[in-house]
Amino acid sequence: MGTAELKIILEFSAGAELLFGNIKRRQLALDGTKKWNIANLLKWMHANILTERPELFLQGDTVRPGILVLINDTDWELLGELDYELQPNDNVLFISTLHGG
Amino acid sequence: MIDSEALENERTKLKREIAELRAALNRKEQCLRDLETTISEATGDEDDVHPDTNGGVCHTQLSNDDIARYSRQLILPDFGVQGQLRLKNSSVLIVGMGGLGCPAAQYLAAAGCGKLGLIDYDEVERSNFHRQILHSEARCGMSKAESARIALLELNQHCEIRCHTRLLNSRNAMHIIRTYDVVLDCSDNVATRYLLNDACVMLRKPLVSGSALKTDGQLTVYCYGNGPCYRCIYPVPPPPEAVTNCGDGGVLGAVTGTIGAMQALEAIKVIVGLGDVLAGRLLIFDGSSCLFRNIRIRSKRPNCHVCSAQPLITELIDYELFCGMHATDKDNPLQLLASEERLDVEEYRNKVQQQPHLLIDVRQPAEFEICQLPDAVNVPLAEVLDDSYLKRFSKQLEDTQLPIILLCRRGNDSQIAVQHVRNRFPKHSIRDIIGGLHAWTHKVDPSFPIY
């Protein structure tokens, strides 16, 4: 591993983007010299890009109920949730659940 | 001078009476249809009809009218006569006759679904028409279920339609759902979604769940095959402040139409046994960039409270309590402030409006553009909460004698704004207007628009 950057894509859908400056897709270059799991990523997001009411995104160390987390289009619950270790070019998608009709 | 208020009252009264008469006519027509069905069964008019195990009837042949009407789907190789007969013998319950329920019901009735149940406690109003496409201006004030029935029977008189005009709750849900094969969740609130899920798990009914807001939509099928239920995916309800309804967030009709039409498609696939049903997957529709995304969601949760082998929930609970939210999308007035921190509209008009004051309207710019009070300045709630408004009003805010009045559409967000602003300016008089602009229309100026 000679690269010093871990490049991943963050996406937000169904209103979750409103908490992150209304940007639906971001390319991140994280510090590649250390290991990143979803728990660290959430802390990084809180410190760097979460612009509106954090309680609408986070609850304790994890996302609040009603937000789904998908890693490469697969539910994070199938992949180890907070412990999933991010790989280069991973796509992490946060979806707010909708209830209207 | 003509008493315009009396005329207006007379008009409202007449409209209501006409709506009631239409509903009564509708019920009579349904009675007649039921009676004719009973007569034709008793006299054995239809030799393709056999009693089924539920005491209903089971069609084993298509009529010539069926063949002509459904010819374009009958010739589909995977659908065919057997598919059409399954639809004809099926019953689907649609919960919510709004933006999702209208198109879903329309496609199911058109496709030849034998029996539709329609649930909605609410009445038709003007703000429904842009997306709830079965209702009409003439049926304003009528029950949504009754209104939808009229439109659906015009489309297909062979469809048997049953209306349930009460709010679905823990006491009536099992009884109503039991008689249907498939349930469509076209509701607009979290409590009803948990209620429908639990009842469908207990009764083993596939639940086709759709939702929409703004330009986004979501769709999946719960309780089908080995797929998960709603609680497997969402074991804990979201915090109420994180839930936005269509009345507050807005929604485009073509978006609910897209999701509603797909709910009908999934119901038809479940009934006919066609294709791959959207279970264990979630369809996400982003209408603003026209992106459909199909994601794999978890399978059944082994310790799910309702659908696992050892469920903790074995009968329906109080879902409004469980969610901390009402089972409707109607206004839930907040009560965050003491009465001395609030102002009613008359007091604002009679006293405050005549004096120097700072009136801050905290709605979104798109809402402010629709209508606004004279002298109001627009500072969206988010800009109040992140203090970016301070710079703009630094001069005025130096004067502790200048009353600050906060205003919004219905008097909820304005209370949140007062709580925030008074912490920073404890010496100022900071109040909000009770009931917001809706109260202004109702009590001060009836010509002020309502949305």
Swiss-Prot record, chain A:
Pathway membership: tRNA modification; 5-methoxycarbonylmethyl-2-thiouridine-tRNA biosynthesis
SUPFAM superfamilies reported in the protein's UniProt record:
MoaD/ThiS
What does the UniProt function comment say about this protein? Acts as a sulfur carrier required for 2-thiolation of mcm(5)S(2)U at tRNA wobble positions of cytosolic tRNA(Lys), tRNA(Glu) and tRNA(Gln). Serves as sulfur donor in tRNA 2-thiolation reaction by being thiocarboxylated (-COSH) at its C-terminus by MOCS3. The sulfur is then transferred to tRNA to form 2-thiolation of mcm(5)S(2)U. Also acts as a ubiquitin-like protein (UBL) that is covalently conjugated via an isopeptide bond to lysine residues of target proteins such as Prx2/Jafrac1, Ciao1, Eip71CD and GILT1.
Tell me where it mainly resides.
Answer: cytoplasm
Q: Could you mention a single GO BP entry for this protein?
A: tRNA thio-modification
* Cross-link named Glycyl lysine isopeptide (Gly-Lys) (interchain with K-? in acceptor proteins), sites: G101
- One GO cellular component term, please give it: cytosol
Q: What quaternary structure, including any partners, is listed in this protein's UniProt entry?
A: Interacts with cer.
Keyword Cell membrane appears in the UniProt entry: no
Keywords from the UniProt entry: Cytoplasm, Isopeptide bond, tRNA processing, Ubl conjugation pathway
Where found? Answer: Cytoplasm
Q: Does the keyword tRNA processing apply?
A: yes
The name of this protein is Ubiquitin-related modifier 1 homolog
Ranges in coiled-coil conformation = none
Q: Which residues carry this modification: 1-thioglycine?
A: G101
Q: Which family does it belong to?
A: Belongs to the URM1 family.
**Pfam families in UniProt:** Urm1
Task: Please give the superkingdom of this protein's source.
Answer: Eukaryota
- Modified how: C-terminal thiocarboxylation occurs in 2 steps, it is first acyl-adenylated (-COAMP) via the hesA/moeB/thiF part of the MOCS3 homolog, then thiocarboxylated (-COSH) via the rhodanese domain of the MOCS3 homolog.
From Swiss-Prot, chain B:
Upper taxonomic lineage: Eukaryota, Metazoa, Ecdysozoa, Arthropoda, Hexapoda
Question: What gene does the UniProt entry assign to this protein?
Answer: Uba4
For the modification Phosphothreonine, the affected residues are: T60
- Signal sequence region: none
The name this protein carries in UniProt is Adenylyltransferase and sulfurtransferase MOCS3
Q: Which GO terms describe its molecular function?
A: ATP binding; metal ion binding; molybdopterin-synthase adenylyltransferase activity; molybdopterin-synthase sulfurtransferase activity; thiosulfate-cyanide sulfurtransferase activity; URM1 activating enzyme activity
Is the Zinc keyword given for this protein? Answer: yes
Please give the cofactor(s) recorded in the UniProt entry for this protein.
Answer: Zn(2+)
Per UniProt, the keywords (alphabetical) are: ATP-binding, Cytoplasm, Metal-binding, Molybdenum cofactor biosynthesis, Multifunctional enzyme, Nucleotide-binding, Nucleotidyltransferase, Phosphoprotein, Transferase, tRNA processing, Zinc
Q: Which organism is it from?
A: Drosophila ananassae (Fruit fly)
Q: What is its EC number?
A: 2.7.7.80, 2.8.1.11
Q: What is its main location?
A: cytoplasm
Chain ranges of the Rhodanese domain: 353-449
